[in-house]
A protein has these predicted regions:
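Transmembrane helix-bundle segments that form internal channels/tunnels in multi-pass membrane proteins
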Residues: 1-69
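Short loop/helix-cap segments at secondary-structure boundaries that form the rim of catalytic
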Residues: 6, 60-62, 80-82, 139, ...
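Metallo-beta-lactamase
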Residues: 37-43, 137-187
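Intrinsically disordered, low-complexity boundary segments flanking structured domains
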Residues: 55-58, 147-153, 202
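Conserved beta-strand hairpin/beta-sheet module of binuclear metal-dependent hydrolase folds
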Residues: 63-109, 113, 174-196
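Active-site metal-binding motif and surrounding structural segment of the metallo-beta-lactamase
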Residues: 84-91, 95-149, 206-209
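Active-site-proximal loop/helix segments of hydrolase catalytic cores
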Residues: 103-107, 125, 129, 133-138, ...
Length: 209
């Protein structure tokens, strides 16, 4: 039997457990131990424990809220967008530090704690290291379906992303950042990369209507 099972390779990924889940788990576990000591059957406890594990495993897929989070990457930007019901998981920029692997030390642990084990897209606003330096490590250690560096409009799941970057030829690389606009849960978000006040003024004059 052991030799048979070793032929199969699979794993289950769970998000970070909540206090409620931990409490229910240990309640059922201790109740089961008590019944075993009393030489009583534990079918009910096993069934409930299995149901709790199943519900916890699928929790990200029936989460109605979604979220927009700025991940602490030390220097630079890294925003995580999760659509309701696991319809899309997206990063905008990755951050980057010269002496630390930000992807394996900060980004991936956070994503896995949220029950996220692949990314539908990673947007890169511009090529400064503190905005894209962790990208290669992230692609090596994590499933990334698409990297988007230059675009006008992009739909991912239920979200419609627009790049509001102006056609003016700015000298600075920072001022040529993608300016990503998206509406999430009736709130408008603008991710501006590293643009200067000059570009902010130009942006306001262009889109103030």
């Amino acid at each position: 039997m052991i030799d048979f099972l070793t032929d199969f390779s699979f794993s289950l990924h769970f998000s970070q457990p909540t206090f409620f889940f931990i409490g229910v788990y240990y309640y059922l576990y201790l109740k089961g131990i008590y019944k075993i000591n009393m030489q009583r059957k534990i079918h009910q406890e096993l069934s409930l424990l299995f149901a709790v594990l199943l519900a916890f495993y699928f929790y990200p897929f029936y989460n109605m809220k979604g979220q927009v989070v700025m991940i602490d990457v030390g220097q630079g930007d890294c925003f995580f967008i999760q659509q309701p019901f696991h319809k899309g998981n997206i990063l905008i920029d990755t951050g980057g530090l010269k002496n630390t692997d930000v992807a394996t030390k900060r980004i991936i642990p956070y994503l896995e704690s949220q029950g996220v084990f692949s990314l539908d897209a990673v947007f890169i606003s511009h090529q400064d290291f503190d905005h894209c330096g962790a990208l290669e490590s992230l692609k090596t250690h994590f499933k990334v379906k698409e990297v988007i560096e230059s675009f006008k409009e992009k739909r991912i799941g239920n979200l419609h992303f627009k790049n509001l970057a102006l056609d003016k030829r700015y000298v600075s690389e920072n001022d040529r950042s993608s300016i990503i606009y998206v509406t999430i849960n009736h709130l408008n978000y603008l991710f501006t990369g590293d643009i200067s006040q000059e570009v902010e003024k130009d942006l306001y004059q262009t889109y103030q209507k």
